[in-house]
Every structure is written in structure tokens, then in C-alpha cells.
């Protein structure tokens, strides 16, 4: 009887892609609801520090490059697709590392949520507006939230891993 020397996969991709899909679903449904409810620039105060508002972001985080001539749409789309490929590779390779994989799944879902916006609308739909007094944090969306939470978890996981190695 011959033995196979194939190496088993170190992590299952499906559960992590499932989490990413849930992020994309909630992100896109929330944006559809805002687009159907609000006119561009309209805002609805929910608390003294939080509004729902419809704004378009043609750039990246905090409106970076939002006034560029249009090339940024395709550059940020390509960046999102490239990140998707790298993240899928990492998830396949490290799927057994739960916190690491969860953080990547959140980042992946958020990145693809914003890529979908860029491909469908030509810009990202932002609608969560936190403010205090006259100061407003730049509006963002659920995809951005997932990316941020994923990044924080990724840093936490790395710090935990490094401390454990000491």
C-alpha cells in the first residue's frame, strides 16, 4: 500500500469566508437602506453625539485622495483585490489560529464591502457620523468598522503571541 505524502491543509477557509460574507452582507444592506432613506448630505441626529448622514467618499480613510482626478477609484479597488488575495492565502495557511483568522476575516469582509461600493457606485457610501461640539469624526460605514476591529484584533493577537514567546 502506497503512502501519500500530500500535506494536509493547515486551516479550513470556509468558516472565515463565511464571517467575511456576513460582514459584506450587513455592510451592503446598511448602505442600501441609507441610500433609499437619505438624500446626499442629509443627516438625522440620533443622539447628541451621533448622526446618520449620507456622504460619498471617493478616496480612502479620512477622505485621503478624495479630490484626485478619478484614478484613485481603480487604485483602491486594485489594493482591495490584492489584499483579498493575500488574506485568503493567510487564512488558508493559518486558519487554525482563531483570533488571527477572525481578524483577517473581518478585514477581508470590510475591504470587499468597500470594493463593491467602488465598482457599483464609483465611491464608498459612508453614513455613521460621530461628533462632539463642533468636531466631527469623518463619516464611515460598517465595512470600515470591520476593518478597524480586525486591525485592532490583529495587533492584540500579535502582541499576545510575542509576549507568549518570551
UniProtKB/Swiss-Prot annotation:
Location in the cell: Cell inner membrane
Segments passing through the bilayer: 9-29, 45-65, 71-91, 100-120, 135-155
A GO BP entry: proteolysis
InterPro entries on file: Peptidase_A8
Alphabetized UniProt keyword annotations: Aspartyl protease, Cell inner membrane, Cell membrane, Hydrolase, Membrane, Protease, Transmembrane, Transmembrane helix
Enzyme active site: 126, 144
Pathway(s): Protein modification; lipoprotein biosynthesis (signal peptide cleavage)
Catalytic activity: Release of signal peptides from bacterial membrane prolipoproteins. Hydrolyzes -Xaa-Yaa-Zaa-|-(S,diacylglyceryl)Cys-, in which Xaa is hydrophobic (preferably Leu), and Yaa (Ala or Ser) and Zaa (Gly or Ala) have small, neutral side chains
GO cellular component entries: plasma membrane
Membrane topology summary: Multi-pass membrane protein
Pfam families referenced in this protein's UniProt entry, alphabetically: Peptidase_A8 (PF01252)
GO MF annotation: an example: aspartic-type endopeptidase activity
Domain of life, source organism: Bacteria
EC number of this enzyme: 3.4.23.36
Functional summary from the UniProt entry: This protein specifically catalyzes the removal of signal peptides from prolipoproteins.
HAMAP family linked to this entry: LspA (MF_00161)
PANTHER family listed in its UniProt record: LIPOPROTEIN SIGNAL PEPTIDASE
Entry's family note: Belongs to the peptidase A8 family.
Name of the protein in question: Lipoprotein signal peptidase
Organism field: Burkholderia multivorans (strain ATCC 17616 / 249)
Amino acid at each position: 500500500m502506497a503512502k501519500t505524502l500530500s500535506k494536509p491543509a493547515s486551516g479550513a477557509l470556509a468558516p472565515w469566508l463565511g464571517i467575511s460574507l456576513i460582514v459584506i452582507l450587513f455592510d451592503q444592506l446598511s448602505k442600501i437602506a441609507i441610500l433609499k432613506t437619505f438624500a446626499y448630505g442629509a443627516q438625522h441626529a440620533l443622539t447628541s453625539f451621533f448622526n446618520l448622514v449620507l456622504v460619498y467618499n471617493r478616496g480612502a480613510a479620512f477622505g485621503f485622495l478624495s479630490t484626485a482626478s478619478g484614478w484613485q477609484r481603480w487604485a483602491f479597488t486594485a489594493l482591495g483585490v490584492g489584499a483579498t488575495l493575500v488574506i485568503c492565502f493567510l487564512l488558508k495557511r493559518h486558519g487554525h489560529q482563531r483570533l488571527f483568522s477572525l481578524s483577517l476575516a473581518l478585514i477581508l469582509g470590510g475591504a470587499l464591502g468597500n470594493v463593491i461600493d467602488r465598482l457599483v457606485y464609483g465611491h464608498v457610501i459612508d453614513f455613521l457620523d460621530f461628533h462632539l461640539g463642533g468636531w466631527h469624526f469623518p463619516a464611515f460605514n460598517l465595512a470600515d468598522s470591520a476593518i478597524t476591529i480586525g486591525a485592532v484584533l490583529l495587533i492584540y493577537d500579535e502582541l499576545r503571541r510575542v509576549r507568549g514567546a518570551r
